[in-house]
Regions:
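Extracellular beta-strand/beta-solenoid scaffold signature
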Residues: 76-78, 98-99
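Extracellular/mature segments of secreted proteins
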Residues: 32-39, 59, 136-140
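Extracellular, beta-strand-rich repeat scaffolds characterized by small/acidic residue-biased motifs
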Residues: 44-46, 53-55, 64-66, 73-76, ...
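Secretory targeting and sorting signals
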Residues: 1-24
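Extended, small-residue-rich solenoid/repeat segments and analogous flexible loops
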Residues: 21-45, 49-50
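Glycine-centered beta-turn/loop sites at beta-strand termini
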Residues: 32-33, 42, 51-53, 61-64, ...
């Protein structure tokens, strides 16, 4: 009986672990350095951050300074791009997926996206936001 319980535990344990979702790693360039992470973070100063698509749940944060953030593809559901403080330029060439967010945050920002199925929010300051279609941006003055 002990062997049967042990064998059953070995069979059930991997199945239980496989049910836990994992985030895919996003590959970006931050100021010319390759970063592979689910949470890509810039510096307190001005940054140039370029990425392909963001996997569901992944995040890119510019932090302070006048950041240039370019996502060449789409944002998966729940992915977040944060400009941070400073006058940021944030562009998402593809679709902003459901539950995904593009946040300009503090100061005046320029945000441009493809179709917005999530949320585009300019934040505080005078923000210029352009979305190709879908949900309209909020907290954008122009």
């Amino acid at each position: 009986m002990t062997r049967a319980l042990c064998a059953a535990t070995l069979v059930i344990a991997p199945v239980a672990l496989a049910a836990t979702p994992a985030h895919a790693v996003t590959t970006c360039q931050v100021n010319g350095v390759t970063v592979n992470s689910t949470n890509v973070v810039g510096t307190a100063g001005s940054d140039r951050i370029t990425c392909g698509s963001l996997a569901p749940g992944d995040q890119v944060s510019g932090l302070g300074g006048a950041d240039y953030i370019l996502i060449g593809g789409s944002l998966g559901g729940g992915a977040v791009v944060r400009g941070g403080s400073g006058q940021d330029y944030v562009q998402v060439n593809g679709t902003v997926g459901p539950m995904a967010q593009v946040l300009g945050e503090a100061d005046g920002d320029f945000i441009r996206t493809g179709t917005n199925l999530g949320a585009v929010n300019g934040g505080t300051g005078f923000d210029l936001c352009r979305v190709a279609g879908g949900n309209p941006p909020v907290n954008c003055e122009a």
